[in-house]
Amino acid sequence: MLPFWIALQFLSSLPVSLPGMPAPREVGRSLLYYPLVGLLFGLLLWLASHLLQGTPSPLHAALLLTLWVLLSGALHLDGLADSADAWLGGFGDRERTLRIMKDPRSGPIAVVTLVLVLLLKFCALWVLVGQGIGAQLLLAPLIGRAAMLGLFLCTPYVRPGGLGQALAEHMPRRAAGWVLLVCVLFCLFLGGWSVLLALAVFAWLRHLMCRRLGGTTGDTAGALLELLELAVVLGLALGL
């Protein structure tokens, strides 16, 4: 179970202690458990939504979104902000884009992107709360983290060194394919057209990454997760 705890420590703000530095092989295997971490997030959000029944819809949605951000420690929002700054400021140049991504400062494009994404997610949750949100809360966190597994499976990792390279090099590819298949079938059963929308957004974002960078980085993987979660909740709110 060590790979699961590695995944949970990396993807969440939950207090997880590991017994020492994990081997690269265990780090690579942790990718297989990313969807399970997403499912855990979805279950916690579902439970919170159940406990918040009777709360005014705007407050209900705001508290759900706050819990959602806190569970991940805003890790992927940081990747989204860095990617937004780099994509606009990179002017189509690969090296400039990668260099801006490493800059810890956030520019106005990053701030505007974060505000818009959080605003849209809040509005979508507000609609879903009004409709009697249920098991659909499982979908977005699960799809977002399964997409990270899919991205590392089919996309080169372009920034040498660090955790991302260990994930990409030591991921058990055959097992990853089976995990993704199970996730897709489960999500299609639960979410229908919203899942197809997420797949389309995944393909489009991956195309943009490959065209600009020749692959992915940790920041663009985080941005992918956030944008796919947004696509799913928007699709559900629109009745897809």
Curated annotation (Swiss-Prot):
Provide the topology term for how it sits in the membrane.
Multi-pass membrane protein
Q: Which organism is it from?
A: Pseudomonas putida (strain ATCC 47054 / DSM 6125 / CFBP 8728 / NCIMB 11950 / KT2440)
Q: What is its main location?
A: membrane
Question: Known NCBIfam families for this protein?
Answer: cobS (TIGR00317), PRK00235.1-5 (NF001278)
Pfam families from the UniProt entry:
CobS
Give the protein's cofactors.
Mg(2+)
| Protein family membership | Belongs to the CobS family.
Protein's name in the database: Adenosylcobinamide-GDP ribazoletransferase
